[in-house]
Design a protein with these regions (language model features):
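Generic enzyme active-site microenvironment
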Residues: 8-11, 145-146, 179, 197
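Conserved N-terminal subdomain of the carbohydrate kinase-like
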Residues: 5-8, 16-146
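A short, aliphatic-rich alpha-helical micro-motif
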Residues: 3, 138-139, 187-191
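Conserved post-catalytic alpha-helical subdomain immediately downstream of the catalytic base
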Residues: 234, 259-292
Length: 292
């Protein structure tokens, strides 16, 4: 499918994913841990920036905004998104640390992950700066994605204001659909979104259910209807891992079975789902066809 001419804005928690790959040939004499002889290191956009990366690789004209620090990780992230053809317009703060996740790999398997991050909501000054960036980027977009990794950008500010609510209102005035990849229990901040794309654990948590207990289809559909009514969602696209996906809207629920594949690292699967869905919606497909 050709997405040339489609324009999408991604707003959310940007981060840098760093990878360290090598061989394990011995155990450390200092502690019972493997010693990795490093062969290669590389960095790619992560979090909301990975959503933008997916969109750009589909051929979508992609813009991205979020909070970063004034640090080396932010500079590396800016270069990484630029290499991907994404227009990154960040709000940098000297009091904030840019999120970086480092994954240690050997033979395609992840041995360890190291997170460097500072999780807090935007200050009033950061919120104002984000609103200004969004005001400049929003006109002419075909869709907006709220990519929430619960790192702070989309949390309510210390004065109670919500960036999600601002984006939803401004996009609504322009007739631009908003899709949200939710985190946490406060789904009210996404109220009015045309679509939310939780995984099974996120869906269960939002419904007050045990995420480790598999829901029956009838119960799942009832809970989805309650969430849609409570938060005025147009629809919910539930990603269910190896069990596929389910789309809940005004029509009969639609289920899609997954094709089984062996995957060593499943990180970023939800990013791909919302990127493809938004690209299809931005191109003009209806929601059912976009989900397919």
């Amino acid at each position: 499918m050709n997405f040339e001419g489609v324009r999408i804005l991604v707003v959310g928690d940007v981060m840098l994913d760093r990878y360290v790959s090598g061989q394990v040939r011995r155990i450390s004499p200092e502690a019972p841990v493997p010693v990795v002889s490093v062969d290669k290191t590389w960095s790619v956009p992560g979090g909301a920036a990975n959503v933008a990366r997916n969109l750009a690789r589909l051929g979508v004209e992609t813009s991205l905004t979020g909070l970063v620090g004034e640090d080396e990780t932010a500079r590396d992230l800016e270069q990484a998104v630029e290499r991907e053809g994404v227009c990154g317009v960040f709000v940098a703060s000297p009091d904030r640390r840019t999120t970086r996740k480092t994954r240690i790999l050997s033979q395609g398997q992840q041995l360890l992950r190291q997170d460097e991050e500072e999780i807090r909501p935007p200050s009033p000054e950061e919120m104002d700066a984000l609103r200004q960036k969004i005001a400049a980027l929003l006109p002419g977009q075909d869709a907006v994605i709220l990519s929430d990794y619960d790192k702070g950008t989309l949390r309510r500010s210390v004065d109670g204001t919500s960036l999600c609510g601002h984006v939803l209102r401004e996009a609504g005035h322009l007739g631009i659909p908003v899709l949200a990849d939710p985190k946490g229990a406060d789904w009210e901040r996404y109220a009015g979104a045309q679509c939310v794309t939780p995984n099974s654990a996120e869906f269960a948590a939002a419904c007050g259910r045990d995420p480790h207990v598999l829901l029956e289809s009838g119960e799942r559909e009832s809970l989805a209807a309650q969430l849609r009514a409570r938060h005025r969602f147009g629809r919910i696209l539930l990603t269910r891992g190896a069990r596929g996906m389910a789309l809940f809207g005004e029509d009969t629920p639609w289920y899609c079975r997954a094709t089984a594949r062996e995957v060593a690292d499943v990180s970023g699967a939800g990013d791909t789902v919302i990127a493809v869905l938004a690209a299809c919606v931005g191109r003009g497909l209806d929601w059912n066809d976009s989900a397919r």
